Amino acid sequence: MVFQALNGLFDLMQNISEIYNLIKLISKLPGLGPKSAKRIILKLINNRKELMKPLAQTLSEAYKNVTRCKNCGSLKSNNSNCENCQNNSKKYNKICVVENIADQWTIESSSIFKGYFHILGGTLSNLNSQKKEDLLLDSLIERVKKNNIDEVILATSATVEGQTTAFYIQDSLKNINIKVSKLAQGLPVGGEIENLDDGTLISAFKNRKGLNSGSD
């Protein structure tokens, strides 16, 4: 009976245009479908002051103020400098190159890497017509030259696109006296960095191999 009542309530919710639009939007989030979206919306409606209003305000503030840094690709607030590349209290000599923000967060949570990140914003791919002009490749080279970087660690995924991108970056850095390395083999073929467990990630970093003559 309770289940039937909830289903009836959910059907009524869908007849309200604002609710219907919310269901469509929330259903697009990772791991959420229409049923989960409806439960979330019901929770929000039942907690307007405690959840719905502050969530709406926080989303609005994030939309206005959170952007990608044009220099390194990391997320930053428009109200402050980029914590990844413009924080003067942090002085590192390594840059870890990743495809996206999720990869950066995964590596940060493992605590294996102490250095700067450079987030490309994707990979070179013929499938989605993404070209080098679409990625932060030129700014990577500029960062290497300006920041006394000793090593660039390529932490792209073990996909065809990820490896193609890594090779392109390696080739772009060949005339700079710097060590270029990549995560150790052992990453599952086709595997994406954000899906790796800490143990696999730590091993891949510790056993990374040099790719050029500047390597140890």
Predicted stretch roles:
Residues R48, I141-D216:
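Long C-terminal interaction/binding lobes of large macromolecular proteins
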Residues Q14-I19, K38-C96, N100-Q104:
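Cys/His-rich Zn2+-binding cysteine-cluster or related metal-binding knuckle/ribbon modules and their
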Residues A37, N87-T156:
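Extended interfacial segments that mediate partner engagement and assembly in macromolecular machines
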Residues S27, I45, S60, G73, ...:
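Signal for well-folded cores of large energy- and translation-related assemblies
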Residues M1-L12:
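N-terminal amphipathic/basic-hydrophobic helices that include classical n-h-c signal peptides
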Residues P30, K49, A62, L75, ...:
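Conserved phosphate/pyrophosphate-binding and hydrolysis machinery centered on Walker-type P-loop NTPases
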